[in-house]
């Protein structure tokens, strides 16, 4: 059904990657090719309305905007 027993990596062109490190959907790359540092800053607003929108952004950051689809494709295809 999907590559690597369901643990697929997100490769170039939204195809099955070589990484196969789980459905965390990180792009397949070696450390010698590319290193990426990502910083997520969260703040607390004075009003509750400002905090509610921030919760959704945290969930998307964990998945990198990608999910495991059929045949180990990215769904949606937004891997970076």
From Swiss-Prot:
The keyword Cytoplasm does not apply. GO terms for molecular function: metal ion binding. Pfam families: Metallothio_2. Disulfide bonds: none annotated. Keywords: Metal-binding, Metal-thiolate cluster. Belongs to the metallothionein superfamily. Type 15 family. Metallothioneins have a high content of cysteine residues that bind various heavy metals. PANTHER family: METALLOTHIONEIN-LIKE PROTEIN 2A, METALLOTHIONEIN-LIKE PROTEIN 2B. This is Metallothionein-like protein type 2. It comes from Ricinus communis.
């Amino acid at each position: 059904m999907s590559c690597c027993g369901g643990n697929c990596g997100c490769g170039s062109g939204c195809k099955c990657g070589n990484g196969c490190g789980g459905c965390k959907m990180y792009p397949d790359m070696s450390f010698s090719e590319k290193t990426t540092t990502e910083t997520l800053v969260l703040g607390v607003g004075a009003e509750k309305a400002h905090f509610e929108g921030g919760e959704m952004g945290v969930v998307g950051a964990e998945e990198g905007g990608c999910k495991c689809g059929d045949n180990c494709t990215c769904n949606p295809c937004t891997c970076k």
